[in-house]
C-alpha cells in the first residue's frame, strides 16, 4: 500500500510541465539530488530515484527546459530492497545547464543558495518548492499520525532559503532544525500543511488532507467530550457516595427525625436518588427547585453533623 507522501508525490508528478516554470522545478531537483561526475574530461550529471514517476518528471523537465533528452537507466537492486532504481543521466551541455540554473559558478564552484530570480518570483517559488518536495520531502498521513511535513536538504543556507520562500511568500510559519547529516525545514500546523499542498499544486491531496483533518478533529472533539462526561460522572459518583455515607451515619447514630425539615427532605431524597448530580438534586428536590449553592449548603450542614458524630 502506497504511503500518503507517495500519493502526494504521484499527483505532483502528473501535473503538466509549463515551459516558463520548468527551470525552477528542475533547479531544485538538481541542487538537492544531482551528482556531478567527471570522466574523460567530460561532465555528466546523475539523479537517482526509486520512484519511476519522479524519474519521468525529471526527464520531462530537462526536455522541456533545454530540448535535450537525457538517458534513463533502469536497474534492479539485488539486496534487501528489490525495487527498481531509476537513473536519469544528463551528459550533454551539463556545465551550461548548471550555470544557467545558477547551481554552478565557474569561479566559486557549487552554489547552494536559491537564485534571486526564483526568490523574487511567486511563481518561481511555487515551482521550486514543488521540485524540493519531490526531491526531499515527506508528509505524514493526517489520519494516523501527528501533523508533520518536511523537506530535507544537505546545505544549511539552502534550507534557510527554503524556509524564507515558505514564510515570506506564503506565511507558512516554517521552522528549521538540524537532522543527521543535513537540515530540514518543516511544518507542524495542519492548516499550513494544507496550504503548502495547495501551493505546490497537489489540489486533490490538499482536499483529501482537509477531509481527513476535519474527521480527525471531530473524533478528537467527541473523545474530549466523552472523557469530560466520564470525569464528571466519576466526580458526581464520588461526591454522592460521600453524601450518602454522611446521611447513613446520621441515620444510624441519631436518626433523621432529629434533623431540620429541610435537611430531612434532602437526606431522604439523596438516599433515594444517589445517581443525581448536584444540579439535578437542586431541580428535583421536593421542596424545590432551589439553587445549586442552596443544595450545596445543606449538604455541608449534613457533613458537619456527620463529622461531629465521628469525633
UniProtKB/Swiss-Prot annotation:
Pfam families assigned to the protein according to its UniProt record, in alphabetical order: HTH_WhiA, LAGLIDADG_WhiA, WhiA_N
Keyword line: Cell cycle, Cell division, DNA-binding
Keyword Cell cycle listed: yes
InterPro entries: Homing_endonucl, Sporu_reg_WhiA_N_dom, Sporulation_regulator_WhiA, Sporulation_regulator_WhiA_C, WhiA_LAGLIDADG_dom
DNA-binding region listed in the record: 277-311
Domain of life the protein comes from: Bacteria
GO molecular function, one term: DNA binding
UniProt record similarity statement: Belongs to the WhiA family.
Physiological role: Involved in cell division and chromosome segregation.
Protein name: Probable cell division protein WhiA
Organism: Lactobacillus acidophilus (strain ATCC 700396 / NCK56 / N2 / NCFM)
